[in-house]
Amino acid sequence: MRRGCRHHLAAVVLLIATFPPLAYNQNIGGINQNIGGTPQNPTINQVSPGQIFSGTGNNPFYGVNLVPFGPEAGDLMVNPSMLTSGMTIDLYMFFPYYGGLYNYTTISVNGYLGFATVLDQGPTINVGPETTDWPRQEDPAMIAPYLCKQQVPQQGNPARRAGVYYRLLLRQSLFGRESNSNLNLGGTLQQNAFFGQQASQACPGTADSYVRCDSNSDYFLDQMMIWVQEGVAGGAMFRADAAVVVTWYNTASAISGRSDIDAGQTGTYQVIWLTDSTARLSYVIINYDRLGFDAQDFRGNSRSGRCRAVFNGGNHTGTVEVDPTQPYKNTPKVLAQRSGVPHMVRGRYMFRVDDVVRPAGCSNKTGGTYPIMIYPNIVNMLGDMTVDVNACCLDRTQTYIMMIEEREVATCQVINPAIARCSLPRIYDWGTKTVYFQPESRGANDEKAFVGYIYFVPPTLDPMRLDIGNIYEWYKNPMTNYLMPITWYPRNFTNPDILTNGNNMGVRISDDSMYGVQLGLYIVGYREFKDDEIKKFRPEYRTLARITTYSNQNNANYRWMPQEEVINTNQVQQWYLTDWERMHTLYTYRVGFFKLAPINPNDANGTQLLPGLVSAPISLHWLWTPENQQFATLTLNQQDRDQRIEFVKEKSREMCHDWYDEDGALWNFIRDTETNTSCPCIETQALLDLGRFMPHPRCSQMFRDITCTTVIGSKNCYMSSSNIYSSYAGNGNTFNNMDTNRFMTHYGQVCCYDESGYLMQTPYQPVIKTQREYFYNPGYPLRAYEFGTAPYMGQFEVPGLSVFHNDYMPYFLCCKFADFRCQMFYWRRPSSACQQYQPPAIGHAQGAGVFQTIDNDKFIFNQPGVFNFLYIPQSVRTPEVRIQTRLERYPNRKVDFGLLGRYISQYELVQPTNATVITGIALEATGTERVIVMTRKDTRRFRYRTNIIVGNILRYFDTIRLQRFRGVLIYVNNVERGQPEIYVVLEEAQIGVKVTESYALDIDRLPNYQESMGMLDIQISVSPQYGVRPDGDKTQETQYRQMYNLPRVSGLIRPYPDQTSGSLNEGLTLNDVNSDSYRQQIINNYLVLGTGEPGTQQNQAGTLNQNMPQDNMFTTSRDEDKQFDVFPEASMRSEPVYKTAPIFDTGSYRFVPQTGAMILQLLNTCRDLQNNPNTDLQPYQSIATLSYGLQCPDDPGQVLTECGDSVACLYDYALLNSKVLGQEEQDAWNMFTTDRALAIRQYNSCGAINIEYPEYMMKTPALSSGYLQGDVARFECYQSHWVKGDHEYKCGIVVDYNRPNEYRFEWNKGNQPWCRSRIKENYFKWLAVIAGIVGIIIVILLIFLVFWCIKRKKLQESRNYSGTAAYSNNAFQNQTYETKPSRALSVGDLSTAPRTVAMPPPRGTTATPMTLEPRGFSPVPSDVRGSQGMLGLNTSV
């Protein structure tokens, strides 16, 4: 046996000997009835040792790989008279196939289930784009297990039961007749006699007897689900509710003779078509029991046409071969020998067919390209998950690996020969990554790597993340409930011991025991910390604790039902931190996430967690506890809860201060966010600026996500659609940086708008917020962009987690958990006030060729072909941008398909009109993927109305609506069914495109339409860096283009780039409808050569369009995408949507552009015919009806009345003959014109007023804009406070009169407003009064003291002690022995004193003369004893 993916017949036989097929009753096999025996439970039994595989079972007529069929199983046989043309049966519900929905099918002996008329003229039945000329010839959709001309033998032994059998099986629950779980577990397949059932006993509402809806049908559907689960990656998610079983038994080639039939050259094969009740998923199982011929003529040679096993989408949507290998091309009979599920049975193949057919199971293809089926193909970037892979047929002795583009290698385990399970490592990236699957032998045995893709998403956007309830509840302190819900699907977990013990040979995916495992719920912390070993800051993931343990429910009831448990936030089962780390290191992890994974008994430290599911990022504050609370109990009393709340507040305050200091040490990134991506001033600008801003994926009405946590309260939030690009900001940045490239930063911008459409400002948040949970949360710039930054590995670069660590969690720490610290956060993260915002140039193409260009020209242009919609050549600062659109003639919807075969032929079903609509758009820029968005073909617009093809592969957006590719961001607004609204952003080019199919109408509410109309509207936004003025002023564009080296922007959306005049307010008139003044100029300049009708282009190639690319982006491929050209998507993008027969390109059917005068004349003529009573007397087939009836709208008078002077409405309504389309065209035109006028306006902003002291202050009005020119902001205080400072401001223009050409916008000058308490104000008043009184008293006393001092001074000056020598007093004069200078007398000259008295000296001292003070009384009498010799003054009068 050879190794690898290549298996020959011997290898398949050996595998079948090891794994015999699933048996009904005692054998697997078609009609191996074992009549009279005891039914047994079907299972995939192991072959006993020594048993020889024969391939026939115990029935000599039927093989082992067929399900029961025939009258005994309830089948009906196709009427022999209808074998060739086919017998149409009713399916009684819709089955999806290749994008269409079918409630019928046509069964033919020629080996197909058809859904349209099949052209079987000639010896060969041709289907598909390569072999049919549709629509001139039929190209029907069909499931063809063996397509070639065949017959049913009419005589002989093989003819005894030869024929085509069919039956329909429906689950009882579809008719409300189910009991219990409706799973007939352990049941048996009872034999039913068809002739014993009356039609009245069939399923309710189904009159045909081939319909079964009883316990046997339920059991059959359950068994088919097991088959799908064992062979298809992701098949466990499918629940079959209906099945169509068709069996071709003993058919022979169409012209074979009796000798061929007797030689056993007959074929027996079977198709089982499964779907669910919602018609969303559909699988086909093909069983080949015996293929005795590979062509339809004598002896099975191929002179008359080879038989094919093929799925055809119909109408040139593409084909898929059952086994596109070289052996199959040599002889299709090999299909009965090989298998896509070799572990089950030979000759069995499985496919998923609800949309473009994808092969399941394994393949023997060893070269070329074969699509891998991977489930899930949307994986969390944190890794540690498993995916199931269908690729090459597997050998258990081999080791298989899956290499991820530019990243690590995933190891894979063989589950069975068709499915491998690969364990993905952690991938520091997000977006689509190409994966390669092959044996580790690396092609030693001619194996080639199978190529597929996996989409890695950040945890914030992962649609398959672990459900832990309302995410916002995890960010509250205190949490509203300590018991939080957790939900998961048990089938997402398997027992790792079964897969790793080396003894899993007999393990089946459908076994319930495989899912019995103990699960641990772990909390993983994330931080960006300093690593001293590498000398850098890097991300770190650490398992902090295991919270609890759950038992994964593995009974059958939980196959589709989720398991619901609770998380006790007061309980921690096991910590992986030491006590010291719990009190210190734990608080360095600001954010974390849950991980649910099987318990690894060998992992004691939580460092080797097994693959599992992770949740969205959550706060870790519920793990913070004071030292006296150690999670010892399951509940907390009120005191403990209060202590924890206060502890969280205090710890949050400390962490807020730490973050404030930490962020302040980093680069001031506000200069980059505000100068390069300033927020739009109003929401309309943000809505139309598609190249630079997008709706917030978690906090906007478009995505309707419930995980918004930080900006609740805004009507809509928008964020920068890519990383902010910065430019050189050093010295000489005015001229020296003109030739420097912009570079990508890791910053992002978030702008939130209130219900009035104005920006919410962070300085006003403390003023407006009146309640703790009041929702006024403005957007703010991000140091770490939410979508991450390449290479997604370092600090600030990890998608989702870096922004929570650096921006979102500090908001909660400062604004939610701590008290009075929100201003600190907003000082570091001030919101943008649009002071540097410049509006983009906006254009729109809608309806039947109605254009509003990006430079404000308006016209209607119709011409089929592929046009250069926008082309920008590459420059030093900007990449090359290429956008092309395909315009096709819209079909005439008045054609009655019921006339097919009587009055009209096949090619006349699609008759074009003279109106062209946009059916596709292709975009790419330098270094990006090529994106193609197209409307789907008619009868294919049910589940998906559009195709989104990236890199030649069809992408789906119904699970995750935002996807990122190389240089391109794509997101859809899937509020309406069928992804009718698609947004494509070229990130570096900053050009955005909005593609809308049929105005995004809700077709379900339009009773006259079964599906959408099939036309695209395109809105484009071009950022101002290209120099296109949105107001249409082009007077100085040439000078600016030369001065600043700007690229030339041209295309169908800007047809006159060299024009020097423009218009701002001119409308659309009838003269602008397909005017000859510009039609041929646009065709010659922008039509891609080789497209459109013959003779359209009047110039030869090479004479014009020297500066325009001429390769058709819809039919060509980039070098890296050419390997996928063999996929059926190639037909979808390269083929026209409304392809017409060649006759409609010539003669009177050629396209004739309709001018405004022609439309008006047509409407007036048709209205006159409508109002002319003689017209009603004419027969229906008259010349008047033939000449005008097919051209006139149904009600021309209503067209003129409804549309009025709206030229766009008149044109669309008249040519498309649809009131809905006409009114929608009018509404879209008016709405875009109004929004565009608002969006291109230059708003002048003063910025928000920074309020430093917001306590007890209110803003009037509270939710007014408060930043635009003319705004008035008044600040008041509540009734308990008085306002201080300047409290009224106006935003206006300030002109420097010394430089009249320089001006700015700012608020009027004033002091900072603030509030003072009335009580404190009264206290200060009383203090002022008391202080005033005391001050007045003090002033009076001071005045009295001053005057008293003055008086005393004057009194002293009035005394003069100086005079004659006799009266001179020398008491204070220095004696001869003193060294100090003489002392002046203080009482003046006393020489005029009347007399002096000599005072007796103290006893024992020498008498010294003294100067006596004048006294107002008489001196002591001289006769007093002891007074002799004394001098005195007599002052008596």
Swiss-Prot record:
Keywords: Glycoprotein, Membrane, Signal, Transmembrane, Transmembrane helix
GO BP annotation list: cell-matrix adhesion
Membrane topology: Single-pass type I membrane protein
Major location category of this protein: membrane
Record PROSITE patterns: AMOP, NIDO
Boundaries of every NIDO domain copy: 193-356
Residues with glycosylation annotation: 103, 315, 364, 492, 605, 676, 914
Renumbered residue ranges of the record's region Disordered: 1394-1419
Cytoplasmic topological segments: 1348-1437
Subcellular compartments: Membrane
InterPro entries given in the database record: AMOP_dom, DUF7658, Epithelial_Barrier/Signaling, F54D1_6-like_C, F54D1_6-like_Ig-like, F54D1_6-like_Ig-like_2, NIDO_dom
Extracellular side: 26-1326
Residues that span the membrane, as ranges: 1327-1347
A Pfam family the protein falls into: Ig_F54D1_6
Signal peptide interval: 1-25
GO cellular component, one term: membrane
Domain AMOP: 648-829
Protein's UniProt name: Uncharacterized protein R09E10.5
Natural source organism: Caenorhabditis elegans
Lineage: Eukaryota, Metazoa, Ecdysozoa, Nematoda, Chromadorea
